[in-house]
From Swiss-Prot:
Gene3D superfamilies: DsrEFH-like. This is Protein TusC homolog. The keyword Cytoplasm applies. It is found in: Cytoplasm. Could be part of a sulfur-relay system. NCBIfam families: PRK00211.1, sulf_tusC_dsrF.
Length: 118
C-alpha cells in the first residue's frame, strides 16, 4: 500500500499547482518511502518533453521530473487512455514511466492511504 499518492491532472503552466505538486512530492520523498505518482487527463502534459515556456514568461519546471530517480521515486504511473486521447506515447515523455490502463490506476488510487491532487 502506498502511503502517499500524488495525482497530477492539470496541464502545466496554466496555474501553479503542477509546480507546487512537484515541490511537495520531492519534499515528501525525504520522509516517506511509500510514494506513488499518477498522471491522468491533461496532467500527462506535465511530462511532455520539449516544452517552451519562455514565450509565456513561466519558469520551466519540467527538469525537476528528472530528479525522481535521485529521490528514489520509483512508482510513476501514466494513464494509457489519457496518452492515447492526446495523441501521445511514452516516448514523448521526459522520464520513464509505467503506462497503465484505468483498471490498474483505480487499484493504485484505491490502495493509497492519502491522495494529494494537483
Amino acid at each position: 500500500m502506498s502511503q502517499l499518492t500524488y495525482l497530477f491532472r492539470t496541464a502545466p503552466h496554466s496555474h501553479s499547482s503542477g509546480r507546487e505538486g512537484v515541490d511537495a512530492l520531492l519534499a515528501a520523498s525525504a520522509y516517506c518511502e511509500a510514494l506513488s505518482v499518477v498522471f491522468i487527463g491533461d496532467g500527462v502534459y506535465q511530462l511532455l518533453a520539449g516544452q517552451q515556456t519562455a514565450s509565456i514568461l513561466c519558469k520551466d519546471y519540467a527538469p525537476m521530473f528528472k530528479l525522481f530517480d535521485l529521490y528514489d521515486i520509483e512508482h510513476v504511473y501514466v494513464c494509457q487512455q489519457s496518452l492515447q486521447q492526446r495523441g501521445l506515447t511514452s516516448e514523448d515523455l521526459l522520464i520513464d514511466v509505467e503506462v497503465v490502463d484505468t483498471v490498474r490506476l483505480q487499484g493504485v488510487l484505491h490502495n493509497s492511504a492519502q491522495l494529494l491532487s494537483f
